[in-house]
Amino acid sequence: MTAPDDTDRRLIAATQAGLPLDEAPYARIAAELGLTETQVITRLSILHAQGVIRRIAIAPNHYALGMIANGMSVWDVDDAQAEALGERIGALDFVTHCYLRPRAPVWRYNLFAMLHGQSRAEVEQKRAQVRALLGAACRADDILYSTRILKKTGLRLKDG
């Protein structure tokens, strides 16, 4: 993998907050950076193939869509099954983030999944679906509800 050059970094900086809402977003970015639309698309494709950019996707604001109940569900599952179970949970359409994390002496949970709903009752129903999917592999679970957004962004490269 080749490290991103200055042009790649400028391209990442120009797109990291999202693509412009435009009929031709890549052409608009190209004009801002002094590139052609083809160069922008090619560079983004290479950065994606190298794993520098994981994905380019629409990311709706779930709060604006009425999804105001958000909880990080945490699960204590057998370590030997955790990856396979995490993949199954991550495939659920109502799970937006799913992570394996190391346990800590005072924290038994190793599988985390973010659930969203229009109410806590809806999120609890989704939690019950995850619990049913995990079955006997789930030894314990909990949910940590968001109370306030302090910061919400993706990775940002510093200018310069």
UniProtKB/Swiss-Prot annotation:
Gene3D superfamilies named among the record's database cross-references: 3.30.70.3460
Pfam family, one: NirdL-like_HTH
Alphabetized GO MF terms: lyase activity
Keyword annotations: Lyase
Catalytic reactions on record: siroheme + 2 H(+) = 12,18-didecarboxysiroheme + 2 CO2
Involved pathway(s): Porphyrin-containing compound metabolism
Enzyme Commission numbers on file: 4.1.1.111
Known role: Involved in heme d1 biosynthesis. Catalyzes the decarboxylation of siroheme into didecarboxysiroheme. Siroheme is probably decarboxylated to monodecarboxysiroheme, which is in turn decarboxylated to didecarboxysiroheme.
Subunit structure: Forms a complex composed of NirDL, NirG and NirH. All proteins are required for the total conversion of siroheme to didecarboxysiroheme.
Family assignment from sequence similarity: Belongs to the Ahb/Nir family.
PANTHER family: SIROHEME DECARBOXYLASE NIRL SUBUNIT, TRANSCRIPTIONAL REGULATOR, ASNC FAMILY
Protein's name in the database: Siroheme decarboxylase NirH subunit
The organism of origin for this protein: Paracoccus pantotrophus
Gene that this sequence comes from: nirH
